[in-house]
Regions:
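Short, conserved post-Walker A segment of ABC-type ATPase nucleotide-binding domains
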Residues: 43, 54-67
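Short beta-strand immediately N-terminal to the Walker A/P-loop
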Residues: 43-44, 98
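The feature captures the beta-strand-to-loop junction immediately N-terminal to the Walker
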Residues: 46-48
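Short coil-to-helix segment of the ABC ATPase nucleotide-binding domain corresponding to the Q-loop/switch region
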Residues: 57, 108-117
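ABC ATPase NBD Q-loop/coupling interface
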Residues: 63-64, 75-93, 121-125
């Protein structure tokens, strides 16, 4: 019997449905993982070292390819839209961002310079990067231009 992916429940921001992750086309590291993040909700992934917490988050933000990993089954939706086939920068553009453990900024740079380091490998033109930077300031007005 064929299994179909469940539809995003009303009010869910993220729906992960029965995903499978494989590294190097051989090593199965996740199988049958599902979770829902309701709008306004908080969800915690708990487990021992090596249980797949970070891999699940990397699957959601589509950062697995950098480590030769891929989602081979299931689906990942953000606001009822499939995002598992999008590039990482498109996932970010839609509002899903993974913040890694620890501090990943350069202390000698300003906030704006740190933000611009993330644009270093983008193929976008300066105007698009400037628009994205303005959007960040709109999301986080407490940063303000005084701190740049």
């Amino acid at each position: 019997m064929a299994q179909t992916a469940p539809q995003t429940a009303p009010g869910n921001v993220i729906d992960v449905a029965n995903i499978e992750v494989i590294y190097n086309h051989v090593i199965l590291v996740l199988k049958g993982v599902s979770l829902e993040v309701p709008k306004g909700g908080v969800v915690a992934l708990l487990g021992a070292n090596g249980a797949g917490k970070t891999t699940t988050l990397k699957a959601i933000s589509n950062l697995l390819r950098a480590e030769r990993g891929e989602v081979t089954k299931g689906s990942i939706e953000l606001a009822a839209e499939r995002i598992d086939k999008l590039s990482p920068n498109e996932v970010v553009r839609r509002g899903c961002i993974q913040v890694m453990e620890g501090r990943h900024c350069f202390g000698h740079l300003t906030i704006e310079e740190n933000l611009l380091t993330g644009a270093f490998t983008r193929r976008a033109g300066r105007a698009e990067v400037a628009r994205d930077l303005e959007a960040i300031y709109d999301y986080f007005p407490q940063i303000g231009r005084a701190h740049v």
